UniProtKB/Swiss-Prot annotation:
Its cofactor is Mg(2+). Homotetramer. It is found in: Cytoplasm. The keyword Transferase does not apply. It comes from the Bacteria. Binds 2 magnesium ions per subunit. Belongs to the xylose isomerase family. The gene is xylA. It comes from Escherichia fergusonii (strain ATCC 35469 / DSM 13698 / CCUG 18766 / IAM 14443 / JCM 21226 / LMG 7866 / NBRC 102419 / NCTC 12128 / CDC 0568-73). This is Xylose isomerase.
């Protein structure tokens, strides 16, 4: 079959001085960073949905892209054509992983029977493509938000029949993920929230969502799926308020239903922006709570109130993110999935490459800066100094539960305590980070 991206062999590393827009300037898969290959640190993935399913439509305009697999025709044939182009893209971009929703890769059909038959046929196609290309599945998931049946949610829907349909999709998608060697399975509650409290029973919906997640965990163990289950937090859009608002909110939810040891988090940069947080904050929070799993690498626009899903281009922002990830030991089953799309006006098919190449170079530079921060150790040293008092006898007695509140009150009085505030040196630390970023 004729190549779709016929003007490109494969994207390769050419170094920082290259002027070739279809080459990497900073991402060298085999370069060692802290003793580990760059590819193994970053674990890049390209997503199926934005890259091959979006037709360029928005709230104010119809599809702007001319994609052969999006033209009228027999649905399964077009899905197979899309898979051909997708794996050509993954191979030529030189990414080790990809991600999908069930209906990204397969026609949904008019019934559950059609859905399952179509998906089974396309999973065979994907398995063959993976074997041929060497590209692996980072994670799979089920789209339980696009079809009109999910207008009031999937797991939180007031109709248990909709809940059951969603369960069928998750069962099918998780089993497909297992068969394809997927390393994670993601749960994103696109419509698990509310538009108005006037018709919403918050306690009922929370109980439904908790039971659904418990059943997902049960099914994972039943089928022997060895990957990681991930929830992807988002505060709103398409609903007014979503129950998986941010990392801290999801932690509280998981604790309530006894799932904090079973499910981790897939953190998206743009969702952090929508929640009023920095990307750095959400990553650091997930790590502090023991829930860090994977990353959807993109960026939002702080001046806009919706999910713009742009490609990451800030080394400053992502260096701090990679610093937290490296300190925590790096990715295990997770990776950096580019949940990002070209702009509607970017109608050249090679714009897909320009967006991903720039993003991969950005994350490679961020990794190198983070490695310098780790190797130098100054930032870590200053944080340790700031909290060093907690290593004292008093600090340890407090943390180990050996002193009560009244014991502490007596201690303060007996020792005539008069502590003096110590500078946090924020400006110094910000300058230190700039040193890592910009000084050679």
């Amino acid at each position: 079959m004729q190549a779709y991206f016929d003007q490109l062999d494969r994207v390769r590393y050419e170094g920082p001085k290259t002027t070739n827009p279809l080459a990497f300037r900073h991402y060298n898969p085999d370069e060692l960073v802290l003793g580990k290959r760059m590819e193994d640190h970053l674990r890049f993935a390209a997503c199926y949905w934005h890259t091959f399913c979006w037709n360029g439509a928005d709230m104010f305009g119809v599809g702007a892209f001319d994609r052969p697999w999006q033209q009228p025709g027999e649905a399964l044939m077009l899905a197979k054509r899309k898979a051909d182009v997708a794996f050509e893209f993954f191979h030529k971009l030189n990414v080790p992983f990809y991600c999908f929703h069930d209906v990204d890769v397969s026609p949904e059909g008019a019934s559950l029977k059609e859905y399952k038959n179509n998906f089974a046929e396309m999973v065979d196609v994907l398995a063959a493509k993976q074997e041929q290309s060497g590209v692996k599945l980072l994670w799979g998931t089920a789209n339980c938000f696009t079809n009109p049946r999910y207008g009031a949610g999937a797991a939180t829907n007031p109709d248990p029949e909709v809940f059951s349909w969603a369960a069928t999709q998750v069962v099918t998608a998780m089993e497909a993920t297992k068969r394809l060697g997927g390393e994670n399975y993601v749960l994103w509650g696109g419509r698990e929230g509310y538009e108005t409290l006037l018709n919403t029973d918050l306690r009922q919906e929370r109980e439904q969502l908790g039971r659904f997640m418990q059943m997902v965990v049960e099914h994972k163990h039943k089928i022997g799926f060895q990957g990681t289950l991930l929830i992807e937090p988002k505060p709103q859009e398409p609903t007014k308020h979503q129950y998986d608002y941010d990392a801290a909110t999801v932690y509280g939810f998981l604790k309530q239903f006894g799932l904090e040891k079973e499910i981790k988090l897939n953190i998206e940069a743009n969702h952090a922006t929508l929640a009023g947080h920095s990307f750095h904050h959400e990553i650091a929070t997930a790590i502090a709570l023991g829930l860090f799993g994977s990353v959807d690498a993109n960026r939002g626009d702080a001046q806009l109130g919706w999910d713009t899903d742009q490609f990451p281009n800030s080394v400053e922002e992502n260096a701090l993110v990679m610093y937290e990830i490296l300190k925590a030991g790096g990715f295990t089953t997770g990776g950096l999935n580019f949940d990002a799309k070209v702009r509607r006006q970017s109608t050249d098919k090679y714009d897909l490459f320009y967006g991903h190449i720039g993003a991969m170079d950005t994350m490679a530079l961020a990794l190198k800066v983070a490695a310098r921060m780790i190797e130098d150790g100054e930032l870590d040293k200053r944080v340790a100094q700031r909290y060093s008092g907690w290593n004292s006898e008093l600090g340890q007695q407090i943390l180990k539960g050996q002193m009560s509140l009244s014991d502490l009150a007596k201690y303060a009085q007996d020792h005539n305590l008069s502590p003096v505030h110590q500078s946090g040196h924020q400006e110094l630390l910000e300058s230190l980070v700039n040193h890592y970023l910009f000084d050679k």
